[in-house]
Structures are given as structure tokens and as C-alpha cells.
Amino acid sequence: MAAINVKALKGEKGYSTLERNSCRPSFDICGIWGGYTGEGSKTVLPSKAYAKVSCRLVPHQNHAVISQLFVDYIQSIAPEYVQVKVTPMHGGEGYVCPITLPAYQAAEKGFAKAFGKKPLAVRRGGSIPIISDFEQILGIKTVLMGFGLESDAIHSPNENFSLDISVSYTHL
């Protein structure tokens, strides 16, 4: 924890930090703003405030139901003198690629051939909503296999990807 400069990690009881960070549902506040946002301070109360949030869903959670539960909850806790407007955007169902799937096992063999070792099966939350549609509508499972490294800093300002790895995975 010293590497990320925190004293302790908290979260859902009964689950490890790895589980909470990868395969459990999450609610994330992506941004909050309102009132004066320039440099310096102001003693003005904002007339409006905004927030952007997202949720990681897991299998058997319906994005429309979860979205409505969120809207209902926010409206239920808002004081009567506060106007609340919640605008649901888009969503998709949760999906897990079974590692027992023949297509996964074939990809695993190709990975081992290209990289000299089997991939580590790790569940990671992500947003590819059409994957669950493939299963529900077309009746097919989709293999999801990442080729990046932790050092790639995916979705960060310093995101990068190794050219050596990208060339290696073309041999799968």
C-alpha cells in the first residue's frame, strides 16, 4: 500500500481487495462539479451541481433495473426543495468468459505458443456491452483475452502498449 500512498483499503466486507476491484459490482463517481470552478476561492453557493457516475455490473444484473434503482434512490434522498434530474446514458449486461470454453482453451494454447507460457486467467471489469448481446441474441460466447501489461497504464494519461507484445500476439 505504500506504493499508492494509502494506509488502508476498505470495501465490501467478505471480499478481498482483488475481488472488489475485479469481479464485484462497483459504483464509481467519475466527476463532480458546480458553482465557481476557477482559481481562488469564492463565498458563493452554487445554484447547480453535477456528477457523472458509472457502475460495473456483473452477470445477472440488468443495466436498466440498476439504473432505475439508482434514479429512485437519488430522488428518495433529495430534500423536497432540491430539484434532481438524473439522465441514464447507456449500459450493458455483465459477462464472464468461461475458461472451460473450448474457444478459450484454443486461444490459451495459441497464447502459450506465442509467448512461451499460458496466460493468467484474471477477471477484470470492463465495458464492452455488445459482448452480452452476442450471448443473449446470437447464442455465442466471446473470448476476451488481454495482451497488455500492468505497466501499460490502460486508460490513464500515460497509456502505452508494447510494440513487441503487439507483434507477438499477431502470431496467435
Regions found by a protein language model. Name each.
Residues 1-160, 164:
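Metal-dependent amide/peptide-bond hydrolase catalytic core
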Residues 170-171:
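Conserved small/polar residues in nucleotide/adenosyl-binding loops
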